[in-house]
UniProtKB/Swiss-Prot annotation:
Protein name (database record): Amino acid transporter AVT6D
Lineage: Eukaryota, Viridiplantae, Streptophyta, Embryophyta, Tracheophyta
Protein location: Membrane
Gene expressing this chain: AVT6D
Membership in a protein family: Belongs to the amino acid/polyamine transporter 2 family. Amino acid/auxin permease (AAAP) (TC 2.A.18.6) subfamily.
Biological processes per GO annotation: amino acid transport
Length: 440
């Protein structure tokens, strides 16, 4: 999941008519939405395959992809039936100011959490990590050996100071289609190379048959633990806060529905291929951040080069998306704290007062949290499921503008029940597992 938001969710004014002459392209809309979907979530998909098995994982990807497309349609239909051009505006029409604040806060949690996840993965790539007593070397250790300056702390510090800081100091984010295209193509490069490596390993007989279904050997806890993998896939399909900014840059906002459908199908295919081939390639040794698996040595220099390209290309992809998330987070936080102030671009003091604490907090979070799986479980079972399913379903059932059909209300009811039930089970299981681990 890379949720690149291009505009504050609570704008102070409607888009000016002068901007109507410069409409966004359909291809740009597809790239922007696809980049919003394919973020760090793809890194945890193979681990979900390991937990759930191949067939349940593929089934859940298809179901969540379909539900995500449907819920995005709910949002646009509600928006066009009313007068709102933002997600928060639609929530405000349905549930008042509290609804707008709720979706803004949840979006901030998702974007900040995603920034931490991105930073953790980048740290894994450049400086390595230790998992279950096994040390996974980063690119810097492989190239230059282990030194104090390429440890995780100093590696991330260098990235934050000399790369992220200059980028997040940019005050305007415009015309994201080109950067989104580059980011998406880098993600696609990762999928292609990992698929080729898996096929080569399969031909050479170096792979084991993947589990088609989960193994339930530990009783009820293992069964309920399956629900902790589903939120990871939900997080990977959360893009709904970017639908409105993309839609209202198009000549016809309804075209975003076709762009969304294409993006969801494309990303579901990419997720399925990534999960299947990476799980086939690494089997039960698949890590929660699959990039860490690509640090293993190979018998050829070509294999080692491909491993490095896989990790480096995706790390660069995340680096390109990171400033977009920061821009959205900062804009929404400013709108929440200072709704009556002048534009953030025109207020240096407020701009720096928000930028530096957010960046420092993200850096500290990436150092303190060693594993992206915990963050994916938390975000997927709380914030992202609210943005992707609970809020859109509630808008349809509320039906303030009278646009909902009986069929849509039935689908929304099922969506709401599934989302809430899965979240409760996932949260309860995570708490139980964490408590049991602490006791042992």
């Amino acid at each position: 999941m890379s949720p690149a938001i291009k505009a504050p969710l609570l704008p102070n004014q409607e888009p000016s008519s002068s901007s109507s002459e410069n409409h966004g392209s359909f291809a740009g809309a597809v790239f922007n939405i696809s980049t919003s979907i394919v973020g760090a979530g793809i890194m945890a998909i193979p681990a979900a395959f390991k937990v759930l098995g191949v067939i349940p994982s593929l089934s859940i990807i298809v179901i969540i992809a379909w539900l995500s497309n449907v819920s995005a349609g709910f949002l646009m239909k509600s928006s066009l039936a009313g007068e709102s051009t933002t997600y928060a505006g639609v929530m405000k029409e349905s549930f008042g100011k509290s609804g707008a604040v709720a979706v803004t806060v949840v979006t901030m949690v998702v974007t900040f959490g995603s920034m931490i996840i991105f930073s953790i993965i980048i740290g894994d790539v450049i400086s390595g990590n230790e998992k279950d007593g096994i040390i996974h070397l980063g690119l810097l250790q492989e190239w230059f050996g282990s030194h104090w300056w390429n440890t995780r702390f100093f590696g991330l510090l260098f990235i934050f100071v000399f790369l992220f800081l200059p980028l997040v100091l940019c005050r305007r984010v415009e015309r994201l289609a080109f950067s989104s295209a580059i980011s998406f193509l880098l993600a696609l490069l990762f999928v292609v190379i990992s698929s080729v490596l898996a096929i080569i390993a399969l031909v050479q007989g170096k792979t084991k048959p993947p589990r088609l279904f989960p193994e339930l050997n530990d009783g009820g806890l293992s069964f309920f633990s399956l629900f902790t993998a589903s939120p990871v896939i939900v997080t990977a399909f959360t893009f709904h806060f970017n639908v409105h900014p993309v839609a209202f840059e198009l000549k016809d906002p309804l075209n975003v529905l076709s762009a969304t459908r294409i993006s969801v199908i494309l990303c579901a295919t990419i997720y399925s291929a990534t999960g299947l081939f990476c799980y086939l390639l690494f089997g039960d040794s698949t890590m929660t951040d699959v990039l860490m698996n690509f640090d293993q040595s190979t018998s050829s220099s070509v294999g080692s080069l491909l491993n490095d390209i896989v990790r480096l290309s995706y790390a660069i992809h995340l680096m390109l998306v990171f400033p977009l998330l920061n821009f959205s987070l900062r804009a929404n936080l400013d709108e929440l704290l200072f709704p009556m102030k002048l534009s953030l671009v025109e207020d240096n003091k407020r701009f720096f007062a928000l930028t530096f604490p957010l960046l420092i907090s993200c850096f500290l979070g990436a150092i303190a949290i060693p594993d992206i799986w915990y963050f994916f479980q938390f975000l997927g079972s709380t914030s992202t499921v609210s943005i992707a399913f609970i809020f859109p379903a509630a808008i349809v059932l509320r039906n303030v503008n009278g646009f909902s059909t009986l069929r849509e209300k039935i689908v929304a009811s099922v969506m709401l029940v599934l989302a809430v039930a899965t979240s409760i089970i996932a949260i309860s299981t995570n708490i139980y597992t964490f408590t049991a681990t602490e006791e042992t």
